[in-house]
């Protein structure tokens, strides 16, 4: 019988330290319980004989005991497998026990005897300890919490855990210890009443061990110790699975602190976990590369694949994720302490100098690469953390004026918007896109609202319109009319009359041109997914409205949590009568001095409107106007702020903990630090208003944005994408002040820089002048549209390939490569694997995670995975490309142009390193109402938009982008491992035979691309203006 054989030959056959489960005994083996019990007792008898007769144990003695323990563990496993319920020793138990081996183990106190002997094994102690940990791991995993209640099991377990403190173990022993501690944390999480069993006085617990000479005496002043947590702390920054298991167990302990205040007190007051986490985070940050390799013209932020490819960044993100999770689940004392340490020990001393690039308080010239990397790391951090407490700490860091010699981080970031370096500019705009996506009141107040609240940028005659929305005002037509003339003409020629978009009548008739029977590119005549090609780039207006509605609603929900409403207020609430009288007196003095006569006698019978300045395009002379009573009462009744009596929103406390730890129903980090009663506004300060018009500044942020917008036609493609996306994100805010600045065509703006609408008019005039409506211009426009549409379909097909089988993946990749060889021979289509690491995955509803399929579109790929098409095609007509699109083969309509074979395409793929970027049409949340292409940007908040579609380039940020028409960046390329990107202009397209007959210059081709992007962006602004009007009119009716 196998039991008898194992009983007699166990030592000889199993003393080589083999794995626990590599035994002839199987847990599922059908066996006799009595035979198992006899064999178990026999093995212990032999092991105990060795223990008793070994003065100092020799190598053979230790090997023999370990072998017997291995068999005993296996027999216990067999017994527990056949027992439905663990039976523990009982004095009055009748009948045979259900688990006789386990009962013998506990009744004979075997675990304690084994521990006492292990303390005498000297250099073999680790081998014996490993077997002990295996035994405890097995018993805990199968008995769960039942054994923890019994002293014969708990006492030796606490002894072995206490003796493990401060010890350095080999990797296999560390692994077993962490696994056991993790199992104990899981059991305690399910049985909170057992927590007190693992709190013990170190002096009392170790006293017996001191008498036996086993351990050193405890330090003076030792207090209650949570032994499990103490043992896990050294492994918090470990790499690999060991570190993950340790951090998981520590998080369980943090969650337990919410249920047991003793644990919270111990961790906050007696453990070193908070300073250890913060110092480790700072150390990991210092190991990050000072310069990120940028091999792409459109790179603007760190993606999940970048995190995976940079080991130092992976470790840093693991530590940051852990800190974020601790703040989320820990006790309030631990949370406040960690936030305090984070701010004082990492954010200010580590991130501050890195972003400001300072050395000993003095600025020094540094290269652009280090600035780009520091800002990219900050952007990654802001997109990764989700806890309001941490977010508030970073917001305070951006606005702090005391820590950096009076200089604010936010001001330094705004200055970099004006950087001539395109990469630094794009990274800065991506960072501001993330900041605006936080919907934080303090940030918006510092960037925009504090410059707009006085209302001095609006002529006095128009200020009463800020809060009052005219339901009959059609701002959409205003933006659509700003489209360049060549784009209007191209739409008229490229689409039938029956389209979803309303027809905009042109005031100036365009020159008549012959309508081509068939466009030379696929982008003008093919009907994709039920939407005409002319509306594939220029998406269905319903898609724009759907996107705008969802974005505005999301922003409105967050802004409702703000402390102030930020509606322009005509009269102050306090001292209203005195201010009114003082204003009238100033007006009388003004007329008596400059008007040449007294005020009319009938002024007492009517309400007089204050001084105003005429519309921005007029001569600027000031006049007076009589306003109806209902307008004044409307302006008077609008409220600026709610009451300031809520204690949870009092942000004037001087302590950091009170600022960082504000909690309640509102998200404190979104709420302003400013006292709401201090924001009392008036526009009747005649001493400044009447003589300062035209010199009002909108702040450095808007000035920088308008400055970049004025150079729209000379910017690179990707800078314009981020620029338009940033302005679009501002337009989503349902605040009357911002709405009046960006979307109201009936309100003039008087500031020291051209207004937004004036800049748009200038851009239209510039494009109309340099790109007149000619056949050559229309052909270049057609190519520009088609190239963007073409790239979107390549990305869409690559994504479908990633979602399917490997065979489908390969076929799809080859199909799109063949289909679009003509328009993008220099842009290889490469499907890329998904990243295993996703630091942006969240369960928080405010920060949606990025899907694996979308992430795969942005992952990098080596050259070995790219495919070379067997046959190249150089289609010169839309029909040939349509045929290739559906078949993946070269078109038979190409004729002599088929000489451009696959070898040429392969060479272009290897030499030109270009980034795949494209446009798609997609409604929000995958809705089919728009009939558009179902692709979306891999973005969590970065929406570099061009018109109805949030055009994004490899965007990864804090909210998921559901865009109507999105410009993606596919990070493919050669074996260098870097991003590849396409040229900013259409030179590569123009060099192909498709527009060989075009006589346009490089400047005209760049202007054509700008015209396409501007036309798309204006349609998005039109949709946002319409939706914002609906939202504000509805809100106005509810007041």
Swiss-Prot record:
What Pfam families does the record point to?
A: DUF5917, KELAA, RAI16-like
> Has the keyword Phosphoprotein been applied to this entry?
yes
Phosphoserine-modified residues are where? 498, 805
Q: Which UniProt keywords apply?
A: Phosphoprotein
Instruction: Show the segment(s) annotated as Disordered.
Output: 831-877, 904-945, 957-984
Q: Where is the composition biased (Low complexity)?
A: 925-945
* Keyword Phosphoprotein among UniProt keywords: yes
Q: Where is the composition biased (Polar residues)?
A: 855-877, 904-924, 957-966
Q: Which InterPro entries match?
A: FHIP, FHIP_C, FHIP_KELAA_motif
Which PANTHER family does the annotation name? FHIP FAMILY PROTEIN CG3558, RAI16 PROTEIN-RELATED
Protein family: Belongs to the FHIP family.
- What name goes with this protein? FHIP family protein GG24907
């Amino acid at each position: 019988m196998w039991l008898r054989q194992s009983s007699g030959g166990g030592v000889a056959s199993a003393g080589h330290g083999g794995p626990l489960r590599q035994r002839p005994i199987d847990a599922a083996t059908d066996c006799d319980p009595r035979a198992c019990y006899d064999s178990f007792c026999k093995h212990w008898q032999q092991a105990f004989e060795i223990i008793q007769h070994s003065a100092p144990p020799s190598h053979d003695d230790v090997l023999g005991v370990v072998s017997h323990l291995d068999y005993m563990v296996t027999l216990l496993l067999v017994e527990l497998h056949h027992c439905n319920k663990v039976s523990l020793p009982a004095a009055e138990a009748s009948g045979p026990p259900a688990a006789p081996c386990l009962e013998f183990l506990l009744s004979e106190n075997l675990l304690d005897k084994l521990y006492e002997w292990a303390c005498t094994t000297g250099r073999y102690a680790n081998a014996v300890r490993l077997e002990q940990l295996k035994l405890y791991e097995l018993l805990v995993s199968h008995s769960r919490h039942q054994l923890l209640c019994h002293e014969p099991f708990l006492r030796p377990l606490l002894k072995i855990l206490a003796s493990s403190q401060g010890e350095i173990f080999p990797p296999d022993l560390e692994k077993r210890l962490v696994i056991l501690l993790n199992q104990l944390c899981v059991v305690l999480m399910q049985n909170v009443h057992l927590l007190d069993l693992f709190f013990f006085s170190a002096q009392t617990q170790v006293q017996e061990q001191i008498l036996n000479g086993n351990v050193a005496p405890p330090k003076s002043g030792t207090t209650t110790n949570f032994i499990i947590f103490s043992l896990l702390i050294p492994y918090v920054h470990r790499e690999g699975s060991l570190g993950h298991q340790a951090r998981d167990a520590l998080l369980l302990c943090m969650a337990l602190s919410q249920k047991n205040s003793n644990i919270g007190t111990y961790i906050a007051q007696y453990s070193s976990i908070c300073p250890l986490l913060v110092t480790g985070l700072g150390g990991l940050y210092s190991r990050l590369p000072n310069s990120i390799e940028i091999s792409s013209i459109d790179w603007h932020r760190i993606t999940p694949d970048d995190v995976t490819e940079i080991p130092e960044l992976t470790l840093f993100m693991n530590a940051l994720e852990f800190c974020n999770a601790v703040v989320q689940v820990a006790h309030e004392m631990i949370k406040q302490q960690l936030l305090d340490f984070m701010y004082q020990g990492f954010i200010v001393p580590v991130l501050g100098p890195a972003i400001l690039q300072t050395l000993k308080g003095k600025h020094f010239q540094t290269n652009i690469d280090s600035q780009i990397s520091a800002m990219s790391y900050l952007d990654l951090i802001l997109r990764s953390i989700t806890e309001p407490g941490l977010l508030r700490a970073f917001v305070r860091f951006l606005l702090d004026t005391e820590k950096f010699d009076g200089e604010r981080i936010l001001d330094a970031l705004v200055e970099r918007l004006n950087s001539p370096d395109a990469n630094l500019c794009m990274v800065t705009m991506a960072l501001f896109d993330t900041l605006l996506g936080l919907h934080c009141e303090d940030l918006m107040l510092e960037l925009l609202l504090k410059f707009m609240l006085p209302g001095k940028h609006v002529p006095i005659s128009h200020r009463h319109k800020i809060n009052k929305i005219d339901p009959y005002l059609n701002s959409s037509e205003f933006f659509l009319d700003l489209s360049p003339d060549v784009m209007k003409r191209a739409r008229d020629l490229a689409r039938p009359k029956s389209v979803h978009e309303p027809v905009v009548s042109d005031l100036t008739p365009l020159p008549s041109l012959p309508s081509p029977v068939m466009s030379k590119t696929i982008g003008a005549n093919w009907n994709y997914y039920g939407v005409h090609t002319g509306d594939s780039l220029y998406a269905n207006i319903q898609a724009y409205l759907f996107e705008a509605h969802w974005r505005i609603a999301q922003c409105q929900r967050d802004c409702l949590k703000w402390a102030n409403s930020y509606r322009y207020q005509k009269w102050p609430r306090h001292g209203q009568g005195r201010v009114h009288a003082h204003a009238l007196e100033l007006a009388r003095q003004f007329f008596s001095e400059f008007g040449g006569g007294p005020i009319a006698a009938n002024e007492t019978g009517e309400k007089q409107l204050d001084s105003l300045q005429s519309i921005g395009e007029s001569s600027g002379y000031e006049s007076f106007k009589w306003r109806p009573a209902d307008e004044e009462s409307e302006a008077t009744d609008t409220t600026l702020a709610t009451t300031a009596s809520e204690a949870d929103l009092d942000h004037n406390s001087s302590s950091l903990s009170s600022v960082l730890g504000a909690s309640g129903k509102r998200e404190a980090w979104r709420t302003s630090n400013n006292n709401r009663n201090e924001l009392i506004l008036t526009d009747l300060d005649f001493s400044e208003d009447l003589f300062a018009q035209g010199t009002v500044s909108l702040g450095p942020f808007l000035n920088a944005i308008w400055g970049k917008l004025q150079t729209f036609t000379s910017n690179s493609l990707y800078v314009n994408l981020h620029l338009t996306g940033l302005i679009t994100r501002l337009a989503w805010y349902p605040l009357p002040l911002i709405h009046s600045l960006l979307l109201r065509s009936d309100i003039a703006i008087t500031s020291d820089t051209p207004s937004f609408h004036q800049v748009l008019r200038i851009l239209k005039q510039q494009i109309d002048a340099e790109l007149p409506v000619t056949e050559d211009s229309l052909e270049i426009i057609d190519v520009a549209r088609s190239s963007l549409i073409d790239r979107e379909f390549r990305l869409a097909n690559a994504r479908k390939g990633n979602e399917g089988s490997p065979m489908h993946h390969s076929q799809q990749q080859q199909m799109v490569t063949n289909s679009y060889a003509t328009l993008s021979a220099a842009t290889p289509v490469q499907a890329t694997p998904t990243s295993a690491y996703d630091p942006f995955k969240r369960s928080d509803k405010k920060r949606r995670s990025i899907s694996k399929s979308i992430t795969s579109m942005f992952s990098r790929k080596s050259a070995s995975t790219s495919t070379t098409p067997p046959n190249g095609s150089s289609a010169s007509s839309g029909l040939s490309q349509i045929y290739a699109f559906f078949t993946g083969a070269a078109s038979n309509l190409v004729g002599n142009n088929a000489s451009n074979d696959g070898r040429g395409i392969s060479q272009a793929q290897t030499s030109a390193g270009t980034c795949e970027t494209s446009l798609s049409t997609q409604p929000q949340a995958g809705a089919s109402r728009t009939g558009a292409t179902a692709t979306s940007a891999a973005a969590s908040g970065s929406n570099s938009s061009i018109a109805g579609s949030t055009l994004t380039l490899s965007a990864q940020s804090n909210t998921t982008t559901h865009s109507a028409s999105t410009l993606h960046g596919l990070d493919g390329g050669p074996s260098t491992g870097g991003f590849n990107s396409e040229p900013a202009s259409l030179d590569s397209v123009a060099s192909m035979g498709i527009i060989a007959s075009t006589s346009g210059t490089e400047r005209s081709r760049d202007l054509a691309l700008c015209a396409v992007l501007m036309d798309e962006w204006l349609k998005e602004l039109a949709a946002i203006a319409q939706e914002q009007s609906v939202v504000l009119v509805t809100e106005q009716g509810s007041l």
